């Protein structure tokens, strides 16, 4: 066999026991220089670093069932809300808090001081019910009725609780915010149910434990030291991940009920909350986490309390993760983090992440945006993308389409990789399943060749960007770089696709992009905008992404108006800057701005919410404009954001639909603004945003500065130092395009999904 050092490299392959010859052959064929196990598989005993670089998954806070038995009171906890119940006209109200929740995943913690760590709230009046007015009774868990997946037996320590409100207000609505013990690890539960592990003898339901408890933390450190000594063949410890899982809660039938990839709900514990009170000077309440049942989802503008909790959790997680990483380094190994699962508190763009000294980050690549989320992480030596499909039986089965998913995954991710290359790519799951689909393996081999060429053809040079700097403005800013409008990682949701297309497009466009928070602008005023040419505010009204009430801050309004007036560009998508202020007469102490979009004067349009129907509006669409030059056919913007009308006769209406403005352009003093109703992902919409940014920045004459493609389905990247261009077809069908710029022009014809290099000086395809 060829020595691993002579292989092509940049590939991590999942392997398993029982297919030794197949593993050896495929590693050689694909040029894999690293191998890994996955959740549910083990590395063959013969694999060592002479064969390939060895990754091994490591779970600091689960998988040790012996310790789980010894630390029963030190489980991961999570705040949950009961279903809402309406009180009867007379008599008490009893609420089974686990109604609707998965009895195999959670158990109410009735051993804690429930008067302190539980809350009963009258949701009608907004009042917290005094603990003396209600009582808690622990009751047995109810059996799971009609489960959707195969669950198997309930964990031995499953249970429920009934809260009785003795004298509720008649017909008021009540909820119970309760402290729940997690009796089954979220990731292992997901994999267990997805793969029908209940049918496999010996599979256990793993219980997670919390490093906030000193005894458990000492055990976790000792266990890692022992494991490192016992596994000298492992080169890279792939932490999957560290301590706290994103919010993932199932319903009573074993289906997903609440998923928030950014959720901090499972990072709570009594020791942590007590430490928080000492450090920040105030006590947390259950409602700080339950948040009326919204659980501080990232679409909510984060409260000051929740920001404090994120900061506190990130700081303590970074300190502990850093200790484990130091142990790995002391043994001469590398530390890699999986960006997912138990990643809460490991914010890779947060202030504490660099202190951990992580060598690498690997994450699942579900879109161009999630690819950039990984590849742009600062302070690590290398990044790796785990590509789809995952080698699980939900795809690798009769009737499944792993080849189609591989093509879609590559076309999607390639746009981001071209702009900000991942250092490595890999896959996960059961290799034995993938081997049953030889055409899939053939395609992976082709994808690998193209991926490697993006590193090798230009000697590591990155493609040139257009001379326009873009800032995406929302409540989260840098902390959630490339992470806006996501619920469950890269999954499609009706309410978000209209806006997710903005960062999906930006992830593959030739711009320098940064993410900026409202606070950054408010506190820094114009200084925050000094290095920016175009600001984008995209989102639905009253969300953290559009801004909501934050636009009542005059400092924010003033900074943006000054920025545009002095020549900057502003692009609003959906319901940008939407906030109706405080209703009331300005003479009576209210703020009656008379508009929904706070910056309607800048945008030249506003939203009609039936308050100004008596006003007549005369929209006259223009037939041609730089922004819509490549819009062939209808503008498919996504979900309807509501009626939008012009507020200035100088506003150029680019697209009208059913009497509403869907795209417009407007001059504001020396600057320019653009309004778009939405931007669901498509190559045409990506081109529309590309042109909108260039126009808003007064940079139309720079359109070909980094080469341009006549066909939106075909993109091009320009490498000036190498005098090379890379052209790539984003469509699943053949496409042709004229590539122009830098004094040259060439016609390219590409097969479905194909990428080709061009020697620009010679005008030849390579």
Task: Kindly give the residue locations of the regions a language model identified.
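The substrate-binding groove and active-site-proximal loops of carbohydrate-active enzymes
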Residues: 9-17, 32-36, 196-218, 300-318, ...
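Extracellular ligand-binding/catalytic regions of CAZymes and related secreted enzymes
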Residues: 248-251, 432-464, 507, 594-613, ...
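A glycine-rich, often tryptophan-bearing local segment used as a flexible ligand/cofactor-contacting loop or short
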Residues: 547-631
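Catalytic domains of carbohydrate-active enzymes, especially glycoside hydrolases
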Residues: 18-51, 223-240, 360-361, 412-422, ...
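Noncatalytic N-terminal accessory/assembly modules of large enzymes
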Residues: 3-62, 66-94, 102
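A short, well-structured beta->alpha microelement
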Residues: 12-24, 38-40, 337-346, 503-528
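Polysaccharide-binding and catalytic clefts of secreted carbohydrate-active enzymes
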Residues: 75-355, 373
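Hydrophobic targeting/anchoring helices
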Residues: 65, 224-225, 238-242, 246-250, ...
């Amino acid at each position: 066999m060829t020595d691993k050092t002579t292989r092509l490299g940049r590939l991590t392959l999942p392997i398993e026991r029982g297919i030794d010859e197949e593993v050896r052959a495929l590693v050689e064929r694909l040029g894999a220089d690293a191998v890994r196990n996955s959740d549910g598989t083990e590395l063959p005993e013969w694999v060592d670093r002479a064969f390939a670089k060895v990754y091994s998954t490591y779970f600091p806070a689960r998988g040790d069932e012996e310790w789980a038995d010894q630390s029963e009171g030190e489980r991961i906890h999570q705040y949950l809300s009961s279903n809402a119940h309406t009180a009867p006209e007379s008599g008490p109200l009893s609420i089974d808090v686990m109604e609707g929740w998965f009895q195999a995943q959670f158990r109410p913690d009735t051993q804690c001081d429930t008067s302190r760590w539980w809350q009963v709230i009258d949701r009608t009046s907004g009042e917290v019910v005094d603990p003396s007015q209600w009582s808690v009774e622990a009751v047995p868990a109810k059996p799971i009725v009609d489960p959707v997946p195969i669950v198997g037996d309930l964990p031995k320590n499953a249970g429920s609780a009934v809260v009785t409100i003795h004298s509720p207000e008649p017909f008021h609505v009540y909820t119970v915010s309760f402290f729940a013990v997690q009796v089954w690890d979220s990731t292992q539960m997901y994999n267990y149910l997805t793969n029908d592990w209940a049918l496999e003898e010996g599979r256990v339901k793993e219980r997670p434990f919390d490093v906030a408890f000193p005894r458990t933390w000492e055990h976790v450190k000792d266990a890692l030291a022992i494991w490192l000594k016992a596994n000298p063949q492992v080169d890279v410890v792939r932490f999957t991940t560290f301590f706290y899982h994103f919010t993932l809660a199932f319903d009573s039938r074993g289906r997903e009920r609440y998923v928030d990839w950014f959720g901090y709900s499972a990072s709570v514990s009594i020791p942590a909350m007590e430490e928080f009170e000492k450090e920040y000077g105030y006590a947390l309440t259950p409602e700080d986490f339950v948040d009326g049942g919204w659980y501080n989802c990232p679409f909510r503008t984060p409260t000051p309390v929740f920001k404090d909790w994120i900061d506190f959790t990130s700081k303590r997680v970074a300190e502990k993760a850093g200790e484990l990483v130091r142990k790995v380094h002391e043994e001469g190994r590398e530390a890699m983090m999986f960006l997912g699962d138990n990643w809460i508190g490991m914010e890779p763009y947060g202030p504490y992440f660099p202190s951990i000294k992580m060598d690498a980050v690997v994450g699942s690549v579900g879109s161009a945006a999630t690819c950039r989320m990984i590849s742009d992480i600062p302070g690590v030596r290398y990044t790796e993308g785990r590509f789809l499909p995952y080698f699980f039986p939900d795809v690798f089965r009769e009737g499944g389409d792993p080849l189609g998913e591989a093509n879609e995954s590559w076309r999607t991710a390639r746009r981001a990789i071209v702009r900000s290359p991942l250092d490595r790519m890999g896959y996960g799951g059961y290799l034995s399943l993938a081997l049953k689909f030889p055409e899939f393996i053939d395609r992976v081999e082709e994808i690998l060749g193209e991926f490697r060429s993006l590193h090798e053809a230009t000697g590591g040079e990155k493609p040139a960007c257009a001379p326009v700097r873009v800032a995406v403005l929302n409540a989260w800013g840098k902390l959630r770089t490339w992470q806006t409008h996501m619920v469950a990682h890269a999954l499609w949701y009706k309410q978000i696709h209209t806006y997710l297309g903005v960062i999906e497009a930006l992830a593959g466009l030739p711009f320098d992009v940064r993410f900026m928070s409202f606070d950054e602008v408010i506190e820094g005023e114009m200084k925050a905008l000094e290095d920016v040419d175009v600001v984008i505010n995209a989102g639905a009204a009253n969300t953290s992404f559009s801004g909501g009430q934050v636009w009542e801050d005059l400092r924010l309004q003033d900074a943006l108006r000054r920025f545009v007036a002095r020549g900057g560009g502003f692009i609003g998508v959906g319901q940008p800057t939407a906030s109706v202020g405080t209703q009331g007469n300005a003479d009576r102490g209210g703020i009656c701005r008379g508009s929904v979009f706070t910056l309607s004067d800048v945008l030249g349009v506003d939203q009609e919410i039936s308050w100004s129907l008596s006003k007549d509006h005369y929209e006259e669409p223009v037939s041609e404009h730089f922004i819509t030059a490549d819009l062939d056919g209808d503008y498919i913007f996504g979900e309807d954001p509501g009626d939008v009308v012009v507020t200035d006769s100088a506003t150029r209406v680019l697209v009208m639909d059913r009497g509403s403005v869907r795209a417009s352009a407007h001059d504001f003093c020396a600057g320019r603004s653009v309004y778009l109703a939405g931007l669901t992902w498509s190559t045409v919409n990506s081109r529309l945003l590309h042109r909108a940014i260039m126009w808003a920045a007064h940079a139309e004459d720079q359109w070909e500065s980094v080469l341009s493609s006549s066909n939106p389905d075909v993109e091009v990247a320009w490498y000036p130092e190498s005098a090379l261009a890379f052209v790539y077809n984003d469509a699943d069908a053949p496409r042709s395009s004229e590539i122009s710029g830098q004094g040259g022009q060439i016609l390219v014809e590409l097969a479905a999904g194909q990428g080709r290099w061009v020697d620009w000086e010679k005008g030849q395809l390579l």
